[in-house]
UniProtKB/Swiss-Prot annotation:
The lineage of its organism: Bacteria, Bacillati, Cyanobacteriota, Cyanophyceae, Synechococcales. Keywords: Cell inner membrane, Cell membrane, Membrane, Sulfate transport, Transmembrane, Transmembrane helix, Transport. This is Sulfate transport system permease protein CysW. The complex is composed of two ATP-binding proteins (CysA), two transmembrane proteins (CysT and CysW) and a solute-binding protein (CysP). Residues 60-267 form the ABC transmembrane type-1 domain. It is a multi-pass membrane protein. Part of the ABC transporter complex CysAWTP (TC 3.A.1.6.1) involved in sulfate/thiosulfate import. Probably responsible for the translocation of the substrate across the membrane. Signal peptide: none annotated. GO terms for cellular component: plasma membrane.
């Protein structure tokens, strides 16, 4: 007769839980606590002063601009790509999916170098812009291109499985009833994919605001001009302006917390709708 040593099983279970919690505390929680401590251990006033710095405000504004540019563009692209890939089988589909995932696998620094080679003054495309006295690299357009590159797959990758699970039956039924394509999208497709879409938009926004590597390569990292919040943190820390650096890091951390809360809410809503 098979017997189970329950006390031993429980010991292993709680040992694994303790190890996992210890690892999470050591790798994630303690560094976050350290950042908040360094930002506020002298009181709130240094933090407020850091937030009033013109370079910080410029970095915050530029970070928001990067998100405002990249999120709508990649949302539209992601919806189109997701619909094409979920609703059609065609030669090269696997290649399309592989290229779509490229920003996940390639180093952001390498991505930045690719953009510099292409859009620099001597690049294939950048030389044409240079002839019109338009600067791409070391300016806002280059930073926007880099941000768009690294955030490209998120919406598509969240919407594709939702569309595949949904199937084309409802859309085809609406079409047989005389609905036009735009009516089908707004009244049938979009309501069914809205939570997956919002989840993808949320991830895109979080990555856009937190991106460092690719943007640092193409921006030139000029304080007050081409410095986003992550770049501002790195520059101020290197310049021994620790209060400003940790203050900006706290802002980024708070944005991450808000993202996590919204992510959890969307996951619960998505799970609820799947269950229904």
């Amino acid at each position: 007769m098979l017997t189970i040593n329950l006390p031993k099983t429980f010991k292993v279970k709680y040992l694994l839980i303790a190890l996992a919690l210890f690892y999470l505390i050591l790798v994630l929680l303690l560094p976050a606590i350290a950042v908040f401590y360094e930002a506020f251990h002298k009181g709130v006033e240094p933090f407020i002063q850091a937030m009033g710095d013109r370079n910080f405000q410029s970095a915050l504004q530029l970070t928001v601009v990067m998100a405002l540019i990249s999120v709508p563009l990649n949302t539209v692209f992601g919806l189109c790509a997701a619909w094409v890939l979920a609703r059609n089988q065609f030669p090269g589909r696997a290649l399309f999916l592989s290229v779509l995932d490229l920003p996940f696998s390639i180093s952001p620094v390498v991505a930045g170098l690719m953009i510099v080679l292409l859009y620099g003054k001597n690049g294939w495309i950048g030389s044409w812009f240079a002839s019109w006295d338009i600067q791409i690299i070391f300016s806002v357009p280059g930073m926007a291109i880099a941000t768009i590159f690294v955030t490209l797959p998120f919406v598509a990758r969240e919407v594709i499985p939702v569309l595949e699970e949904l199937g084309p039956e409802q859309e085809e039924a609406a079409r047989t009833l005389g609905a036009k394509d735009w009516q089908i999208f707004w009244r049938v497709t979009l309501p069914n994919i809205r939570w997956g879409l919002l989840y993808g938009v949320l991830l895109t926004n979080a990555r856009a605001m937190g991106e460092f590597g690719a943007v640092a390569v193409v921006s030139g990292s000029i304080l007050g001009k081409t410095s986003t919040l992550p770049i501002f943190v790195e520059q101020e820390y290197k310049n021994y302006q620790t209060e400003a650096a940790f203050g900006a890091a706290v802002v980024l951390a708070l944005l991450a917390v808000v993202t996590l809360v919204l992510k959890e809410i969307l996951e619960q809503r998505t799970g609820h709708h799947k269950a229904v």
